[in-house]
Amino acid sequence: DGDGDLDLYVVSGGNEYSTRAPALLDRLYLNNGMGSFNQSTATLPHIYASGSCVAPADFDNDGDIDLFLGSRSVPWKYGLTPTSYLLENDGVGNFHIVTDDYNPQLASVGMVTDADWIDYDNDEDLDLIIVGEWMPVTVFQNNGTYLLDVTAKVGLGGTNGWWNCILTDDINGDGYLDLVVGNLGKNSKIWASESEPATIYIGDFDHNGLTEQIICYYKNGKSYPMVLRPDLIYQIPMLKDQFPTHADYAGKQITDIFTVDQLKNAITKNAYIFANSIFYGNETGTFRYQPLPAEAQFSPVYAIVSGDFNSDGWKDLLLGGNFYGVNPQRGRYDASHGVMLIGDGSNGFIPMSIQESGLNVTGQVRDIISITYQQGREAILFAKNNDKIQVYTVANN
């Protein structure tokens, strides 16, 4: 609200609520200047969305903080594209939806998980970087009056993944911002590439008014559904007659289960990259893709922080993740204990072992921050889902 103290914006979301549930409304808490927060109910538009993130920035250069609200999913209909929003501040802390004024495509950008505002083209206004599931690392260039989708132009077309988070920083010290992006990783039963993507089909296959999702992956050049027969029959009972036994279902491709018309009428989304990755910016205004080292691919990454942790003059990366909410046949993703990657000064990284880094972070990490305390000492805080915060101090040497 521009009164000189920090306020708190809380994004709400979840799959357990209907699309008009009050629990999906975001909340804004205004600071009274003495560390006490009061919820402001009149300053935000009523947006019922399963949100994932908020990215604050003065994107219109009028001196106040505006907001991008990223939506994660449509409740009960995973795979469908939710609506995201651009909110403009009127100067006194009231926000209005202006998505259509800057780019209507922004509303349907995808299943957003994270976003950030950066001036990637050095023209003194902020551009919007968005990541999410089944979508590319997406760039909207701010030309002062419009947010133009330049994803393909900057070399990020076809980067669709299951992206979880993004960190923007000049990692290699060349003066251009780089994008470090957390993904599924490569320690999984499902793989993806440009020629053999992971695919999701979304549709009402049995015409019962409910949306089904079928995820497929390639093996030996053929596309197979990930879902086991009992789970598929539970969702689409009409297939029981077609596949009465497990033997009947075994080895069936997606085209053996559904007709060409059924698949054609379904909404289809692809993912081509599962590697946790870095995209290096350069003087041409484009980004160059590079997967992070193998040690960074053992588990999904949901949190990233950068810093010169070994005081050698080069930026390092610290990654956290894991995900336990997985069905038994896929197995939970729990192989990360915190990954320290030491920058080598030549666009590469040297992974540190647990013994070398001292990190042994258990659980599902969802955020990492670095703080300074007690005579300039540095501490790293790991926030974990349904768990206590884990704290490490950075050694002076």
What are these regions (language model features)?
Residues 1-397:
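Beta-propeller-forming repeat regions
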